[in-house]
Amino acid sequence: MMYRVSRTVTTCFRKKPLRINIQYRSFTKFDSFGDTPIPASKQRFVPTSGTYPKGFLVGSTNVGIKPSGLSQPDLVLVTSEEQWETCGAAVLTKNEFPAPSVLVTRELIKESRGRGVRGVVANSWCANLLTGEKGLEDSRKMSKEAGMVLEEGSTKGKDPNYSDLGMGGQRLPIDDIIQGFPKLHQNMGTAHNHWLQAARGICTTDTFPKLSSRTFTLPSLPNTKFSIAGITKGAGMIHPNMATTLGIICTDAPITPSALQQLLSTAADKSYNCISIEGDTSTNDMVTMFANGAAAPTHSPIDFDILAASQSADFIAFQRILIEFMADLAKLVVRDGEGATKFITIRVRGAPTYPAGKHIASVIARSVLFKMGVYGKDPNPIGVLAALGYSLMDTEFAGKGIINRELTSVSFVPADGAEELNFVKRGKLMEVDELRVKELMEKEDVEVVVDLRDDGSGNGEEAIYWTCDITHEFVTINGDFRN
């Protein structure tokens, strides 16, 4: 669902058909992205099996939204069976020009407070941004028709409500979408391939589908296995501000609506909101999550008490699990950045607060000079220091002595666990082994550590950002976007 790159639509739903909205992105020479083989270097990121949450059904189909000749799915539905008390939560783009779908989704979550919000319908390769009243009518029609089809075809009385996330410039092929809903419903299931095909169905310029799942336990139920699964997408227009891509996450753990929203918002801040490809925050993006409690239907749900000094052990444990899980999904997005050849970790240590450290890391992650240097296999620390030097200008952190040249060190950490290479030590450039530098920069994974307080005390907060290099291919993809 990114405005220039994603062409994906997302739709949350609950009890009765609500409203919907979608996305558009017009491809020409890159229309072939949809059916190209997964690059050999990326195949290791695509799981061949998984463990998926109980009570969730996933389906996908091709309704002809993608350019003629492409066979991959372009319409996706993820929903919890109605027998389970399900709640939903979402984090939405903070771009000041949000798509109507974002506004509708925000309204739905606000009105329902997450109760009864059971799933998402999404389409790729066509958006609905900047299409006026006709586009809004298409969205509402899509929502209504999808709900009617699910109601008629369900043995469990499904009657969903929809809202969606989208992109703009051209109206949806609404008739094709409506005609595809019965087939979409027939294709729903719980197997690994259902999830994998759904992950394929939200891809646009992605080179591989992004899917992850895992099991976990909670302190109060150590013998009960819970599951969490998620699909995500995004290859360009990626920079955090409360959702930077489309993400759909489901768990069969019992969680109250208020707790789910709190858990998702906190986890997004330390995962999806810590990635950047080219520094552009999309108008359409959303990460949404659903919990149905199907793995422990009689157990008291995880709750959130805003007045409590601390939360329950289950809440704390699940928060940690969710942050790790969402970080793994978010890193898959970066690994598939448009044209990217390097996966870069920016680690800032010694910051007085986490927000300050995160802000510094985000500025370095957006430095075109630094990112192009990594692409050219030149680890020149000047790009890092330049970005660090201006990172706090005109911010709430300016003038507070956070950056001290005489205490600042910059090093590159080899992916193989070898000793790190110190390029700057307490403000001074260091001589380095050029052979080791060459070996380091040949690796796909590059980690840069910026220590703001290299005084041996170990004091301060640590913040991490993930980004990628800027390549010739990135320029080609975006320069030829509509040609």
From Swiss-Prot:
Known EC number: 2.3.1.35, 2.3.1.1
Swiss-Prot/TrEMBL site (Cleavage) positions: 243-244
Residue span of the annotated presequence: 1-26
Pathway: Amino-acid biosynthesis; L-arginine biosynthesis; L-ornithine and N-acetyl-L-glutamate from L-glutamate and N(2)-acetyl-L-ornithine (cyclic): step 1/1; Amino-acid biosynthesis; L-arginine biosynthesis; N(2)-acetyl-L-ornithine from L-glutamate: step 1/4
UniProt site positions, description: Involved in the stabilization of negative charge on the oxyanion by the formation of the oxyanion hole: 166
GO molecular function: glutamate N-acetyltransferase activity; L-glutamate N-acetyltransferase activity
Compartments where found: Mitochondrion matrix
GO biological process: one example: L-arginine biosynthetic process
Catalytic activity from the UniProt record: N(2)-acetyl-L-ornithine + L-glutamate = N-acetyl-L-glutamate + L-ornithine; L-glutamate + acetyl-CoA = N-acetyl-L-glutamate + CoA + H(+)
Binding-site list for substrate: 204, 233, 244, 338, 478
Keywords from the UniProt entry: Acyltransferase, Amino-acid biosynthesis, Arginine biosynthesis, Autocatalytic cleavage, Mitochondrion, Multifunctional enzyme, Transferase, Transit peptide
Entry coiled-coil feature ranges: none
Function noted in UniProt: Catalyzes two activities which are involved in the cyclic version of arginine biosynthesis: the synthesis of acetylglutamate from glutamate and acetyl-CoA, and of ornithine by transacetylation between acetylornithine and glutamate.
Subunit structure: Heterodimer of an alpha and a beta chain.
PANTHER family given in the database record: ARGININE BIOSYNTHESIS BIFUNCTIONAL PROTEIN ARGJ, ARGININE BIOSYNTHESIS BIFUNCTIONAL PROTEIN ARGJ, MITOCHONDRIAL
Family, per entry: Belongs to the ArgJ family.
Protein name: Arginine biosynthesis bifunctional protein ArgJ 2, mitochondrial
Organism expressing this protein natively: Botryotinia fuckeliana (strain B05.10)
Classification lineage: Eukaryota, Fungi, Dikarya, Ascomycota, Pezizomycotina
